Amino acid sequence: VSKNAVFVGDNNSGKSTLFEAVDLVMGPDRLSRSPVIDEHDFYAGEYLANDTPVQIKIEVTVIGLSEDQKIYFGNHIEWWDRCKGALISGPPASSTDAESVEPALRLAFQGNYNLEDDDFEGQTYFAETLREGSTPELFRKKDKRNCGFLYLRTLRTGNRALSLERGSLLDIILQMKEVKPQMWEDVLNQLKGVSVANESELGVSDILTSVQDSLSNIVSYEAADKPQIKVSNLTREHLRKVLTVFMGSGAYHEDGTEYLTPYAHQGTGTVNTLVLSLLSIIADIKENVIFAMEEPEIALPPHIQKRVISTVIEKSTQALFTSHSPYVIEEFLPDQILVISKTNGHLTAAPAGMPPTVKMKAFREEMRRRFCESLLARRVLITEGRTEYDVYSTAAKKLQRLHPERSCSFDLLGIALVQANTDTQVAPLGEYYKKMGKTVYAIFDKQDDDIRKKIEVAVDYPYEATEHGIEDVVLKGVNQEALLKYGLKLVEDNEWPSHLSTEAPRAGMEFEKLYKTMKAFFKHKKGDGALAELIEYCSESEMPEFITETIFAIEKSVYSLQTVPVMIEGEV
């Protein structure tokens, strides 16, 4: 993984799984969770194979160590060759002097189901001590804190950030600054003297007295004497959970004092920004920090999203993100965008790289406008241009409304559309997406044999039209009566262009003339979505057969790879 990176992909593609795996190895507080792993951490929930426990093994190699880390982990240092992307496994010792070689720390997690205890177990180790003949040495909590790995699952977890619960961001800061609040005894003593609702007129004390009288008929009076309501359990652990920070809300009492609310009651964006401020403090305290952050865009406007990314990158040794936001993704170089894909439990990541024909100076704009959605999807449909993009997406949505029991919409099929801008770029784009492990579809005009063959090799599902342009695909395939009605409606609504007034559609117009004048109209309106508007105007039987059959074929291909839902069994 490069110094900084963003992992992108469809939902459930494995982005969070990757971060969870690293957290199992390096998270200081992760092993305190009980159990440390469970049934669902195993592929398909299978933690036994023929009554033999299945092992979960995770290995992480950390490079770019600070001088303090090199000293602290001195006995466990190995050597990493950046050019080969591998550890140096043996002599000669002089190989460690190469410029491309640097110290590395290899760490491992091993976990499994324990048959004897009927429970799951797991532990982290310095990986080199797991070699045969060596004594395994634990990678302990103190060691993990020296690695500086911080995992923020999503900013929605901010409800604990400013509490004093163990593992909260505020607690981490206090530990790192070696601040130990000597307040618990004072607070507990104060709270012990506070009773709630003791006044008889409130009626609560009378009820508690009745409870005591009822209990005395069952157990001795010493066992349940003088019930009272207290502020908390009066333990340090419970105080950690209930104490929280209050902040000004912007509202004021009549006496001019500001009304304070628990910080979690602030706006979501404010809470998220507070969390990031705490992370910034942590980064300032530690020399080497590796941030792993999920979806930093939640509840933040685009300009704040960008600021978050730049701030975290600036303050960390390495920053890793997951995201679905184009404003986050465009902040990274093409090789820093890692596209995650998963097939039958096998997880792969490939750098997005530079899309074909896109120049570096236009990368950010093109990423946001054309490519971001397709990088996040499992399946991609390539169209030649914007008009084709609009026509096929409109037709698919129309068919979805007509057949709600099916899955015709590209959104429901998990397919992102991307336009190639020209027929010669369909094949290069297909290769670009297939390299990332995506299923690639392409709909294109009738082509010469050479271009057709290149496209067929480059994509998984090619669909070639019978005409040499999208206008002809629609005009020659649409129902003639529907086309005339649409043309007459344009005239009636005063939407027919004045320079074509002598050729305006009229009742009884021959199809050849209608075809010619409507083609001129659509050429004039190219890029305005007029052709897609015609598709929206048509009923299913009036739509071009090539378009409807292609959409149904795409639907069928998606479900042929899965268990076919009952609603679409049989022929389409």
Which residues does each predicted region cover?
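Switch/communication elements of ASCE P-loop NTPase nucleotide-binding domains
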Residues: 1-27, 246-373, 559-572
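Conserved catalytic network of the ASCE P-loop NTPase/AAA+ motor domain
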Residues: 10, 48-53, 98-102, 142-145, ...
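Conserved P-loop NTP-binding catalytic core
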Residues: 20-101
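Short glycine-/polar-rich loops that comprise or flank the Walker A/P-loop
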Residues: 54-58, 103-107, 145-149, 317, ...
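Conserved beta-strand position immediately N-terminal to the Walker
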Residues: 5-6, 150, 380
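Acidic, Mg2+-coordinating catalytic modules of nucleic-acid enzymes
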Residues: 369-382, 386-572
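Extended helical coiled-coil dimerization/tether regions that scaffold
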Residues: 161-164, 173-274, 278-290
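Electropositive, glycine-dotted interaction segments
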Residues: 65-186
